[in-house]
């Protein structure tokens, strides 16, 4: 059984709802899922998972501080140990959505392996957005090969 870690930060609850949908998709694909807010996630969480989903809201065309905090704290303790670990990203926004680029850039610095296109959600995740988030979770679980 694959272990999928979902690390996110949320201000209004939209990104939390998106994280929950990603978790539903990963669980439906047979993965064991751990969801943590960026402020409480630890570098060991990243080392112990088989795949990771990174989610945030748009903060002035950048990822939110909670996710950035986790990535800052995790970089050096995990350096060279997470290369090619499958990852996917999701992002909620009110109109721009350009902050997803910051997540993908930092994931590249970790040398994580992108296994699905990012899901961008304008506002509250509903309808097709929920389906896309669940699919993202399933793809992430499948990418581990376990």
Q: For each of these PLM feature ranges, what is it?
A:
Residues 2-4, 14-17, 21-29, 34-41, ...:
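FMN-binding flavodoxin-like domain, especially the glycine-rich phosphate-binding loop
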Residues 9-13:
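Short polar catalytic/cofactor-binding loops
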């Amino acid at each position: 059984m694959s272990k999928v870690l979902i690390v996110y930060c949320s201000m209004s609850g939209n990104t939390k709802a998106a994280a929950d949908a990603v978790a539903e998709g990963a669980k439906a694909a047979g993965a064991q899922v751990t969801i943590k807010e960026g402020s409480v996630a630890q570098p060991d969480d990243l080392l112990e998972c088989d795949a990771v989903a990174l989610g945030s809201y748009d903060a002035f065309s950048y990822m939110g501080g909670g996710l950035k905090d986790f990535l800052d704290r995790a970089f050096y303790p995990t350096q060279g140990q997470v290369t090619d670990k499958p990852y996917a990203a999701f992002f909620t926004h009110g109109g721009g959505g350009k902050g997803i680029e910051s997540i993908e850039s930092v994931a590249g610095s970790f040398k994580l392996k992108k296994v699905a296109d990012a899901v961008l959600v304008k506002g509250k995740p509903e309808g097709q957005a929920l389906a896309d988030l669940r699919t993202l979770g399933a793809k992430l679980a499948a990418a581990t090969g376990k």
